[in-house]
Amino acid sequence: ATIAVDMEVQKHIATNDRLELSATLYDAAGKQVAQRRTRVSDGKEGITKENLTLKITNPHRWNLDDPYLYTLKTELLSNGQRIDGCETKVGLRTLKFDPNKGFALNDNWMKVKGVCLHHDAGVLGAVVPPEVWERRLNNLKEIGVNAIRMSHNPQAPVVYDLCDRLGLLIMDEASDEWEFPKRKWVKGWNK
């Protein structure tokens, strides 16, 4: 498998420090499976973009029954010392779409059994504790759901993290209107 890591550094002042970007991938047990480093091309003020490619032999693929997640650790180093960075969970998988066969996850053709999920939790409102999301997603998975459509807007990051961890596919939605705002009264749809 190949992971493309796109990194961006914004320097507010010029520096003569030796700046490096590092991307390291760890398996679920914490063992390092891939790493790449590159020197930031210049120390000038402004934005620098770098691309790193990590190669993984025999990857453990994420799937619905075994939602295996790696940890990608990205760092900015100045003279060898970490000055910024983050960790991101990463699932490795392949997707195929065919007009006759449908959808395949990791070369396994399957039915997508999805539901629409809105951002609120009924009487709890729109600020939903993670435990409530986890319970709801587990209940959906127990009744055979394998995919969630995020209706009608991007959800809280915790929902995506839980879907990754629990083995649920996601169809994300940017908005429920593409070109014009809702004007249902124009054709009498509001009656």
Please place each PLM-identified region on the residue numbering.
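Short, glycine/acidic-enriched loop or turn micro-motifs at the edges of active sites
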Residues: 176
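Secreted/periplasmic carbohydrate-active enzymes, especially glycoside hydrolases
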Residues: 1-162, 166-170
